[in-house]
């Protein structure tokens, strides 16, 4: 019984150190869990993705998940995700978007292909004492939809990468979700560069294979393409 109890405590401790992004925030309103966000495979375990070559790195969708709804938001507005329970591991925060192809819908499109562009990245503050990550401890994260983004249906992908064990290959931990949006009032921008998931990252990218503790890094290279500023 003691062994079983210890095992359950260990599992509970591991789950509490991990996290999900279950709810979309729009117009200051927190929507229901997995209402506009595709339910992720870790919705019970909170466990991360560690293989950047797997299909899970795209949206980490739970097989047989309930269909999510699509929320209408204005270009130039701020949207976000809740974090359950909160961001625990040190690492960067990034947001990507992908436009749903003509003839398809946000609730059924799988997001495959070279279609993703980055709209936000947040790295560390660096000083001689170490790296400080602005996303540490957050229970909500937000991003502005570029005002020149063309109107249409999109997937919005949030990603926070835990680098506490990233000194070995595949040690980086990816926590992510995809929400379904219809962007209105957009412009005539041309988002890019475009990447695919999987494909955007290599397990040996400098921002994914790194000891963030010692020797203290003097720089940090965020993984993925440059941000499209709109």
Curated annotation (Swiss-Prot):
GO cellular component assignments: extracellular region
Induction: Expression is up-regulated during growth on wheat bran compared to that on glucose. Expression is also highly up-regulated on beechwood xylan as the sole carbon source.
GO molecular function list: metal ion binding; monooxygenase activity
GO biological process: cellulose catabolic process
Record keywords: Carbohydrate metabolism, Cellulose degradation, Copper, Disulfide bond, Metal-binding, Monooxygenase, Oxidoreductase, Polysaccharide degradation, Secreted, Signal
Reaction it catalyzes: [(1->4)-beta-D-glucosyl]n+m + reduced acceptor + O2 = 4-dehydro-beta-D-glucosyl-[(1->4)-beta-D-glucosyl]n-1 + [(1->4)-beta-D-glucosyl]m + acceptor + H2O
Known cofactor(s): Cu(2+)
A Pfam family matched in the record: AA9
Binding site for Cu(2+): 18, 89, 175
Signal peptide: 1-17
Biotechnology: Lignocellulose is the most abundant polymeric composite on Earth and is a recalcitrant but promising renewable substrate for industrial biotechnology applications. Together with cellobiose dehydrogenases (CDHs) an enzymatic system capable of oxidative cellulose cleavage is formed, which increases the efficiency of cellulases and put LPMOs at focus of biofuel research.
Cofactor note: Binds 1 copper ion per subunit.
Broad class of enzyme this protein falls into: oxidoreductase
Family: Belongs to the polysaccharide monooxygenase AA9 family.
Protein name in the entry: AA9 family lytic polysaccharide monooxygenase H
Native organism: Malbranchea cinnamomea (Thermophilic fungus)
């Amino acid at each position: 019984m003691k062994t079983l109890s210890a095992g359950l405590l260990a599992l509970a401790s591991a789950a509490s150190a991990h996290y999900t992004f279950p709810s979309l925030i729009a117009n200051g309103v927190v929507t229901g869990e997995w209402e506009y966000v595709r339910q992720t495979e870790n919705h019970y375990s909170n466990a991360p993705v560690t293989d950047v070559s797997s299909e899970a790195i795209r949206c980490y969708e739970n097989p047989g998940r309930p269909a999510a709804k699509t929320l209408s938001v204005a270009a130039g507005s701020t949207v976000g995700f809740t974090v359950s329970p909160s961001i625990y591991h040190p690492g960067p925060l990034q947001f990507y978007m992908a436009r749903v192809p003509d003839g398809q819908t946000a609730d059924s499109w799988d997001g495959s292909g070279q279609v993703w562009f980055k709209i936000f990245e947040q790295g560390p503050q660096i000083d001689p004492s170490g790296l400080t990550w602005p996303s540490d401890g957050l229970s909500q994260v937000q991003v502005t939809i570029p005002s020149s983004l063309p109107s249409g249906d999109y997937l919005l992908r949030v990603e926070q990468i835990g680098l506490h064990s990233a000194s070995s290959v595949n040690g980086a931990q990816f926590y992510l979700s995809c929400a379904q949006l219809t962007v209105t009032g957009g412009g005539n921008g041309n988002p890019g560069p475009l990447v695919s998931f999987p494909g955007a990252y290599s397990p040996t990218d400098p921002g994914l294979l790194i000891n963030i503790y010692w020797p203290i890094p003097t720089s940090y290279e965020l993984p993925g393409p440059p941000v499209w500023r709109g």
